[in-house]
């Protein structure tokens, strides 16, 4: 299995041999969907809350008399039928959204994503990405020269200059291999992997 090795202008300078176990797997759509949903669910804080009719602040006074008004009878304004009343089935903060995925499935799913990105031409390898200063403009110009508008960079080591330069770019994400996640891999149009990160990805997902 070979991937394109890009130069600083985003052009294919050569080809690089990469492990089939990570970049040459068959795509399993059901498995990828499962790990993406699990990742998003596990990222939820689970702090949303609404009030039922017993929790909203209200008066216990009857809004209007029982008979003679032509309206449907009403006991108090906390009823879910009234604006400002409680919810019938409120969301509670003790809900558990956790989805469990075992390590073998997660590794297989991540490898399937990397393999599909390689087949679609959305995955490329660069020697390294080093900056002399933490200037966002320098990194933005670098990606512009490579014709990259939406890019995720997986670098073997993210130094302070690279981190500071990338954090203010909306469509750029720079992470180390251990922080690569399925949602970001699927979302970005291009994924750049530094040469030094290939071995780390193989250790994690092979």
Curated annotation (Swiss-Prot):
<dbReference type="GO" id="GO:1990904">
    <property type="term" value="C:ribonucleoprotein complex"/>
</dbReference>
<dbReference type="InterPro" id="IPR013005">
    <property type="entry name" value="Ribosomal_uL4-like"/>
</dbReference>
<feature type="compositionally biased region" description="Basic residues">
    <location>
        <begin position="56"/>
        <end position="65"/>
    </location>
</feature>
<dbReference type="GO" id="GO:0006412">
    <property type="term" value="P:translation"/>
</dbReference>
<comment type="function">
    <text>One of the primary rRNA binding proteins, this protein initially binds near the 5'-end of the 23S rRNA. It is important during the early stages of 50S assembly. It makes multiple contacts with different domains of the 23S rRNA in the assembled 50S subunit and ribosome.</text>
</comment>
<protein>
    <recommendedName>
        <fullName>Large ribosomal subunit protein uL4</fullName>
    </recommendedName>
</protein>
<dbReference type="GO" id="GO:0019843">
    <property type="term" value="F:rRNA binding"/>
</dbReference>
<keyword id="KW-0689">Ribosomal protein</keyword>
<dbReference type="InterPro" id="IPR002136">
    <property type="entry name" value="Ribosomal_uL4"/>
</dbReference>
<dbReference type="Pfam" id="PF00573">
    <property type="entry name" value="Ribosomal_L4"/>
</dbReference>
<comment type="subunit">
    <text>Part of the 50S ribosomal subunit.</text>
</comment>
<dbReference type="InterPro" id="IPR023574">
    <property type="entry name" value="Ribosomal_uL4_dom_sf"/>
</dbReference>
<comment type="function">
    <text>Forms part of the polypeptide exit tunnel.</text>
</comment>
<comment type="similarity">
    <text>Belongs to the universal ribosomal protein uL4 family.</text>
</comment>
<dbReference type="GO" id="GO:0003735">
    <property type="term" value="F:structural constituent of ribosome"/>
</dbReference>
<dbReference type="GO" id="GO:0005840">
    <property type="term" value="C:ribosome"/>
</dbReference>
<keyword id="KW-0694">RNA-binding</keyword>
<keyword id="KW-0687">Ribonucleoprotein</keyword>
<feature type="region of interest" description="Disordered">
    <location>
        <begin position="44"/>
        <end position="77"/>
    </location>
</feature>
<keyword id="KW-0699">rRNA-binding</keyword>
């Amino acid at each position: 299995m070979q991937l394109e090795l890009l130069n600083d202008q985003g052009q294919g300078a050569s080809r690089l041999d990469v492990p089939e176990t990570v970049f040459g797997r068959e795509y399993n759509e059901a498995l990828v969907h499962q790990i993406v949903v699990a990742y998003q669910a596990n990222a939820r804080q689970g702090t949303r809350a609404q009030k039922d009719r017993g929790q909203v602040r209200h008066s216990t006074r009857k809004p209007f008399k029982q008979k003679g008004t032509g309206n449907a009878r009403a006991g108090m304004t906390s009823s879910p039928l009234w604006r400002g009343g409680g919810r019938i089935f409120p969301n509670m903060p003790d809900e558990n959204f956790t989805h469990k995925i075992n390590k073998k499935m997660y590794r297989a799913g991540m490898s399937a994503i990397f393999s599909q990105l390689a087949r679609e031409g959305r995955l490329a390898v660069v020697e390294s990405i080093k900056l002399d200063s933490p200037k966002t403009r320098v990194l933005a110009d670098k990606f512009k020269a490579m014709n990259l508008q939406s890019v995720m960079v997986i670098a073997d080591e993210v130094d302070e200059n690279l981190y500071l330069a990338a954090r203010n770019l909306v469509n750029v994400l720079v992470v180390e291999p251990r922080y690569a996640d399925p949602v970001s891999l699927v979302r970005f149009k291009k994924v750049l992997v530094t040469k030094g990160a290939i071995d780390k990805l193989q250790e994690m997902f092979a």
